[in-house]
UniProtKB/Swiss-Prot annotation:
Main localization of the protein described in the UniProt heading: cytoplasm
Organism ancestry: Bacteria, Bacillati, Actinomycetota, Actinomycetes, Micrococcales
PROSITE patterns the UniProt entry points to: ADOMET_SYNTHASE_1, ADOMET_SYNTHASE_2
Provenance organism: Leifsonia xyli subsp. xyli (strain CTCB07)
Positions of the UniProt region annotated as Flexible loop: 100-110
Name of the protein in its database record: S-adenosylmethionine synthase
Subunit structure as annotated in this protein's UniProt entry: Homotetramer; dimer of dimers.
Subcellular locations according to the entry: Cytoplasm
NCBIfam families: metK
Reactions listed under catalytic activity: L-methionine + ATP + H2O = S-adenosyl-L-methionine + phosphate + diphosphate
Family: Belongs to the AdoMet synthase family.
Gene name of this polypeptide: metK
UniProt-annotated binding residues for L-methionine: E57, Q100, D251, K282
Amino acid sequence: MADLRLFTSESVTEGHPDKICDQISDSILDALLAVDEHSRVAVETLVTTGLVHVAGEVTTKGYVEIPALVRDTIVEIGYDSSDVSFDGTQCGVSVSIGAQSPDIAQGVDNALETRSERSQDDLDRQGAGDQGIMFGFATTETPQYMPLPIWLAHRLAERLAAVRKDGTLGYLRPDGKTQVTIGYEGYVPKSVQTVVLSTQHARDIPSQQLRADVIEQVIEPVMHAAGVETSHIRTLINPTGRFEIGGPKGDAGLTGRKIIVDTYGGASRHGGGAFSGKDPSKVDRSAAYALRWVAKNAVAAGLADRLEVQIAYAIGKAAPVGLYVETFGTAHVPDERIIHAIREVFDLRPAAIARDLDLLRPIYARTATYGHFGRELPDFTWERLDRVDDLRSAAGL
């Protein structure tokens, strides 16, 4: 046991202040895509005590009532009364939205390939919305090809929200966080060492009652469903002793501050660009989704047991300027063959990504909580295993 490498990931519930902001930003994005699929959207949200501020840049042919969307999202999360620290029906909402910069738009609408290289390929017309680096990752640790710590942390956070909403633990409130520490031998998870769970609750709930209820109704069901024995797990429930004040009253929140929660829990590197509130022309989002698709299919194809893929773009240029893989010593073919196979099987120009993953749809609000990756939902097209055979063939397997 002393030789185990301990690795930890965290998640948060939908009532966490930063996640409130992500959900508001993505709900606005969805509403705009529903009325104009070519909307250009970059929306940031800030929440604090009694106030929501929405700012950003939007270019669209449609119209949405942003204050109403904000309030509906907050109430749906569960903040509908001052008794739970925030009230979506009464809070102030301010909106500061401008148009996308024409300097950016000209590079997205008319990429370098068509302006300078005279390309006639329609997929070369759309340039990347910004420069930057993005990463995708997959591992054989779980059936979902996700790292086990973040996968369990998300499931605990989901369960925490579920028992609040269905009344099983009706005294819980929307804000909460989870954290899971796994003991590894190499890259193989061997045991769950520690679970930390903090949950907002109603006044005057005895800490021992909350602890017993959370272990019985949240931790044990999630761990048992994952085939994890719970008797040896160290559990820390509300370690401060009290968590009555939560949500924006306890901490200000901001879109894009949970980028490690949104991705792989720290098991993979991150390029720094957040997802929520951004339409698919922003490669921060669309390319990160595409690289999850790439990595998951490559691992499922047996090219490696653990794979990280990096891509880089230049603003206003369609084709990526860099592609790199890291296999952590787990590759079953040379890394050069993996890169060759990826280039042969996947078109990673922004327009091709949006086409192949069907991204010009209002599908993003659901991504804003409990992870953008690892949930095999119908609209999460980047989780499909539809290029496995092509990759095996391209890699010579």
